[in-house]
């Protein structure tokens, strides 16, 4: 889909769960928040930039620090930051491993699965809440009937109201699962499901499709094997410091000394 900034949005927020994080029975998952350059100083948290050290080597440094409450006082924004660092790291490495091509394939697979089900349901005279969709469909149907049939097949749809059923698809949705979904809605109308014909072309309107590049940084285009990715993760780990290496200097809310005797 087209980037929010190309639509004129100043701020965009959302969930990053779809980027490699399992559902986990509801959570946790990382989220994202992005803004135009003009508003970056109003962003919560810390923004890290690339600079050079005194020897001329590239170095990461804090380009913008907005969290410290002793500095910002009543204007501090740390209260809207969360400690989902592990989830954010998983999301980042998922993007590193898959790169722009992999993310496009995943998005297309999810969309075509939704489009295949949408076409099959419309052929059975079901009405979609919207003709324009990416990976999620909302269908007008008798929710109680569909729910009973779906549970028999081990499928849990979302039922926003008595007359609506909602479902989402992803890159691991199989043809067998698609056929099962279609058969459930066929049974709800007392019909027998016909053979499902896969949709192979995007249904997203041209005006909504993204044309601009993304994930162009070298790190998102360098690691395509499991071994290469693991070596990269290990390289980053060796740059970190922990209590296994030395005491962590007191300097901020995230750098304190936890003596081994206290970690029981």
Question: Where do the language-model regions lie?
Answer:
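Conserved C-terminal alpha-helix-loop-beta "cap" of PLP-dependent enzymes
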Residues: 55, 101-184, 193-197, 230, ...
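Conserved phosphate/anionic-ligand binding catalytic regions in large, soluble enzymes, centered on
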Residues: 21-34, 38-39, 83-87, 241-262
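Generic, well-ordered alpha-helical scaffold segments in large soluble proteins
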Residues: 3-7, 15, 34, 38, ...
